[in-house]
Each structure stands twice: as C-alpha cells, then as structure tokens.
Amino acid sequence: MGTKTCISCGKARNTNKYSQNFKLKNGQPGFRNVCKDCDLLRKNKFISSTPYTYLTKVHTQSKSKRSKDMEWSITSEDLHDLWDEQGGRCALSGIFMTYGKDGNGSKEFNASIDRIDSSKPVYTRTNVQLVTYRVNIMKHTLTEDLLLWWCRNLIAKHDKID
C-alpha cells in the first residue's frame, strides 16, 4: 500500500484513505487526488448549502430506506415546495428548521419528512409535512392530536412543579 498527498488538506496518507476511481494502464488502481475525509467534508458542505440541496438528499435517502410496502410518490420538488409554503418553519412547532449536514449524526432542528397520518403507509404530497427532526422523533406514530395531548400534560405537570 502506497501513500499519496491530498490536494485539499495537504496530508500524506495511505492510499486506503482515497477512493479508487480508475485503473492505470498497467492495471494498478488509480486514486482520487482528494482523500475520503476531505471529499466527505466537501459533499456535506454542498448538501448544507441551501435547504433545497439538503431536501433533495433527504428525499433520496428516505426513499431508499422505506419499505417496499410503502407508497412513495413525493418528489424532491414537492419537498422544495413544502419548504417554501411553510416558510422554512416546522409544521407543528413553528420553529425555523435548519439544513446542516456535517457527518456527526442527526441535528435537532434539521428538516425531516413527517407523515401526517402515520397509520397510512403512504408518502404522498397530501400526507407529508416538514417538521424538525426532534418533533418527528417525538411524534413517531402518534396522531397530531395525541402528540399535542401529551405535550399539554407535560406542560401542566411542569407548571405544577414550578
């Protein structure tokens, strides 16, 4: 295994830290000029550059993760339209959503695709909304009414303690 210097970070690294993207005439592997770490940073920066690039990535990832039993008819353009219609705010909390991707896991305020009626196995334009990642985790399979009931009870209990 040889070493190669990344043109982005300037670090000399083992070639296993580079993506192979071609073969040389002698049959040996050819590697990209940018290491995998720098390439990932570049991709994440691009994905995080606008809400639309972020939502396009979310659409692609979400569609491929869903069960084959689920109907998926929304497009990335539908998500872009939802972002605009909602003014970049979470449909349930009204909080401004973020769209950052840095490779360090889920972000509390990032936009997330939520099925309005989780009992229906459909991702259609009329059954999805954009919410923050945290709100989507809290809602899970609950109806909106049941989620709000839980929230009111949590607040009532908290107010009694204060």
Regions found by a protein language model. Give the residues of each.
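Short recognition patches in nucleic-acid-associated and regulatory proteins
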Residues: K11-G27, T98-S119
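Active-site-adjacent loop/helix surface patches within enzyme catalytic domains
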Residues: S93-M97
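Contiguous alpha-helical segments
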Residues: M1-L92, T124, I137-M138, D145-D159
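Polybasic, low-complexity binding patches
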Residues: G100-G105, N110, I116-Q129, I137-D162
